[in-house]
Amino acid sequence: MTKMEINEKYVLIIGSSNMDLNIYSQRLPKPGETVTGGTFSQFLGGKGANQAVAAVRSGAKTIFIGKIGQDPFGDQMLSRLTKEGIDMSNVIRDPEHLSGVAFIMINKNGENMISVAPGANFYLNKSDIVKNSEIIKNAKSLVVQMEIPIETIEEIYTIASEGDCIKILNPAPLKPIPITILKNIDIIIPNEGELYRLHSLLNFPEIETKGTNRIIQASKDIAEMGINYVITTLGSKGCIIYDRKEGVVTEIPTIKVNAIDTVGAGDCFNGVLASKLCKGETVVNAVKYATAAASIAVTRKGAQESMPYAEEIDEQIKKLP
């Protein structure tokens, strides 16, 4: 059971925690090519842990549930995330599998390529989730990503639907999503590529229009699965919110910055969004706040290290067009 009182409002993040091994170079290598002259850095990462850091730094009480190895990387994860103020008391240590690792290559424009060895993350199972049922049902907002097994994700949302939490899915890395999951979530947050791939995986007809109209139509189709909000992140172009119940589309611009590292920007967005929803903000206002936060994160190296604090976001949001 968590250290937090069960009647406190909190963000619950369930997902992955990795060690990120980053190489920064002028450009990304092509298949079969070696690019030299880069610099190396080691950071804590994993979509779930990144989002937990973003949530807690932006002011929300935050609980993280995941599975990490009984190894030095796992020790670092537990220590560092606890120091951030995240409740890690429900994290499972796996004696049989190593902690997850991500190898990340980043070019001079901040664009990246990532390869992940999930390790213990991929052994977070349904029984681990059932043991945490009360924590899940009593969360104010819940975020899950797809670096853990799909059957585990399905169990999470089944349990969450017995409570009143705001259920958010970040469908990354994208893979086929059972209809039972889509019918159990309130908000889905894909990037543009994930939106179109999910639309195709769900066997909707090909959309002939381009640009914003294509995003809106894909969002409408996916929302008909029963999802209240489809929020599509567009990187430097901001994001588009589709509200199914109101039939309203809202475009949120971003803040122009000099991006040096986009790793973790989406995680920053998701974690901060969950934090603001936990505090009672509307979806549109929460998205604006999350957009401002992500615009800070891309100006810094590292995933968790780049996550801004509440006071920084409060200043940055004043620059939103």
Q: Where do the language-model regions lie?
A:
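A glycine-rich helix N-cap at a beta->alpha junction
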Residues: E84-E96
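Conserved phosphate-binding/catalytic loop of the ribokinase/pfkB sugar-kinase fold
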Residues: R93-D94, I104-S141, M146
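Glycine-rich phosphate/adenosyl-contacting loop at the front of the ribokinase-like
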Residues: M1-K67, P72-I86, N258-A259
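Active-site-proximal loop->helix
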Residues: P72-E84, A102-I106, G110, D128
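Conserved phosphate-binding/catalytic region of the ribokinase-like
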Residues: T2-E8, P176, T180, E206-P321
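A short, aliphatic-rich alpha-helical micro-motif
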Residues: S133-K137, L182-K183, E224
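Conserved beta-alpha-beta core of the PfkB/ribokinase-like small-molecule kinase fold
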Residues: S141-Q217, K237-C239
